[in-house]
């Protein structure tokens, strides 16, 4: 699992910190950091919550 640069770029486009995104979806900042670093495999429900918050699709953020 590589770094999730797509997630980081989408978060930055929305002018959100890792903490802002974490608060918006109900997880810790560390969880967002680990997902972006490719060290944590989020559940489908968490992926969907992130996508809704960032106005992106699963394809755009998580799948190639």
Regions flagged by a language model, labelled:
Residues 1, 12-13, 40:
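Short amphipathic helical patch at the helix-1/turn junction of helix-turn-helix
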Residues 5-24:
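Short basic helix-loop element that most often maps to the first helix and adjoining turn
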């Amino acid at each position: 699992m590589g770094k999730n640069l797509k997630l980081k770029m989408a978060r930055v486009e929305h002018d959100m910190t890792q903490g802002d995104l974490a608060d918006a979806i109900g997880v810790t900042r560390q969880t967002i950091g680990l997902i972006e670093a490719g060290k944590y495999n989020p559940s489908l429900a968490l992926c969907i919550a992130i996508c809704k918050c960032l106005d992106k699709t699963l394809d755009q953020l998580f799948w190639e």
